[in-house]
Design a protein with these regions (language model features):
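Sec/Tat signal peptide C-region and signal peptidase I cleavage site
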Residues: 18-22
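Alpha-helical cap/lid subdomain in secreted, periplasmic
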Residues: 76-86, 90-95, 106-252
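Serine-esterase "nucleophile elbow" of acetyl-processing enzymes
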Residues: 24-101, 116-123
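Mature soluble domains of exported/periplasmic/lumenal proteins and thiol-rich metal-chelating peptides
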Residues: 23-24, 254
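Bacterial N-terminal signal peptides that target proteins for export
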Residues: 1-9
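Short glycine-rich loop/turn motifs that provide flexible caps or phosphate-binding loops at active sites
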Residues: 17, 57, 63, 101-104, ...
Length: 254
């Protein structure tokens, strides 16, 4: 038996036992790396002489309210990564600003009237966009969701910022239209040629189904503190922003 065959067999066995979950992360990073925005993002973050403004827009999961039980949410973890861990020494990017404007219950449709103000107020370099959970619950029109998401991406680009779309993580509520909304985010990202973080794909690999792992969730819709750790891990891997010896990215991810 050749060494290649042995390695293939071992990887297959690891995948079956749930310990080999890197495929979606690697694939998404490769997809993102082909885009001009990926190079632009890395040029910005590697320019240590110029602080960056990072803006997060989204719903209660972005806000991180209540369901982490006072522990950090994924936006706060990201702040730790960029402001302290990234660069040749701790605190190299200490002057970066990370703004979380997540609103409980928000949808892409609901965000649109406020988008111009937020973009003008904060003048971001990068905007992380995460909608879909409440859009599926409250509106239920996938085509409208895609249209509104595209409009948000367009406004971000007009503001000379880099948009990063996020596919929402899995839930345990069993709602039938969740996969359609995940596909909608992917479709908009491809159409608009923008960076994408696919939480749902990684969570599906971890659970082996379309339902989130119970120990990553606080209730049917909201991730707990561990779930938020998984989210920032996914962001870092898929955008290729992984500080060497990062304590944040070494957090347990069972």
């Amino acid at each position: 038996m050749s060494m290649k065959t042995i390695i293939t067999a071992v990887c297959a066995a690891l995948a079956l036992c749930g310990t080999c979950r890197a495929d979606s992360l690697t694939d998404m990073n490769a997809r993102n790396a082909k885009l001009p925005d990926y190079k632009a993002l890395h040029n910005k973050i590697d320019n240590f002489s110029k602080p960056m403004m990072w803006l997060f827009v989204g719903d209660s999961i972005t806000h991180g309210c209540m369901h982490t039980h006072t522990e950090r949410n994924f936006v706060e973890h990201w702040m730790e990564i960029v402001k302290w861990e990234y660069g040749p020494k701790p605190g190299t990017r200490k002057d970066d600003i990370v703004v979380n404007t997540g609103v409980s219950g928000e949808t892409a449709t609901g965000f649109l009237p406020n988008a111009k103000w937020r973009l003008g107020q904060f003048k971001p370099d990068v905007v992380f966009i995460k909608f879909g959970i409440n859009d599926a619950n409250k509106i239920g029109d996938v085509e409208k969701f895609k249209k509104d998401l595209s409009a948000i991406v367009g406004m971000v680009r007009k503001a000379k910022a880099i948009p990063v779309l996020q596919v929402p993580m899995l839930t345990t509520d069993g709602r039938a239209n969740r996969p359609a909304y995940a596909e909608a985010v992917r479709a908009v990202a491809d159409k608009e040629k923008c960076l994408l973080v696919d939480h749902a794909a990684y969570w599906k690999e971890a659970s082996g189904s379309d339902t989130a792992k119970n120990n990553w969730m606080n209730n049917d819709l909201h991730p707990n503190a561990l779930g938020h750790r998984i989210m920032v891990y996914t962001i870092a891997k898929e955008l290729g922003i992984e500080p060497k010896n990062s304590p944040t990215l070494k957090l347990p991810t069972p």
